[in-house]
Amino acid sequence: MKTLSISLALLVSTAAVVACDKTPPPAPQEAPASSSSSTSAQANAAAPKTTPVTISGSSALQPLVNAAKEKYEATHAGASIEVSAGGSKKGIADVASGAVQVGDSDIAAPDDVKGQLVDHKVAVVGFAAMANKGDFNAKVGALSIKDLARIFSGDVKNWKDVGGSNQPIVVINRAPASGTRAVFGNIVLGGDKFVEGQTEDNSGALVEKLKQTKGAISYLALSFANPDLVTLSLKGDAGVIDPTDANIESGNYPVWSYEHMFTKGEASGASKAFIDYILTPDFQKTVLPTVKGFIPVTEMKVTKDG
């Protein structure tokens, strides 16, 4: 019996030793995140998406705002700018009602909302009469303001009456909400009404309509000048005045306006940051001059109301 007890004790002792020697396998480890996933996560954490800055209004100003949007979003992580057209009067109405944060316009704010809005003049742009290109107006490179007024009021109906050949004139207007229409009408028509006819809601669509319509004429910001259209200079007492930057800056070419970005009250937050970016000397001197048709306000040697 004693021998049996000793044997059992030895067996238990041996089993314990064996059990102690069996080290449990290491717990499985999660695979480390890939470098690209980690970098992407860090970038997203560092650049949270912000509430978009909403802008509507002038199609004449849209090319400049789109250029600013592209540069700004590329250099300001998380920034988002949403731009739509519709005309200057729509932009003013939208910002006054709170539908958007910024209203773009070629014209000053009307008296009924002027007290609510803060004006940021971001550029100057010129306007010109532009026409469908053809043999009928090949020799018509310039018209006087008087001749333009006669065309757009409907008094002159054929290109032969202004130095061209026999071809009916088709006037295509911008819609009543257009700032381009308001600026051109105030300077050229002096308060007279445009002749009734076809209309287009935005400048881009108008360019295409002019290309397709024989004998057509309209008015556009120089930011929409197109080699497939005739851009008409002005005839003045001293000769022909081309719509160049130099002539606009000096005031020799009179058909121009300030480009406004209106906010309801003082700009703040993301909208303020975007407008401030457009007004920086760097943008005004290096980016703005590369966008066709626009001139920094600081380059103007003359001023005007509106």
Residue ranges and their predicted role:
Residues 1-7:
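Bacterial N-terminal signal peptides that target proteins for export
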Residues 7-8, 23:
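Intrinsic disorder/low-complexity detector
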Residues 15-19:
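C-terminal motif of bacterial Sec signal peptides marking the signal peptidase cleavage site
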Residues 21-97, 105-306:
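Exported/periplasmic ABC-transporter solute-binding proteins
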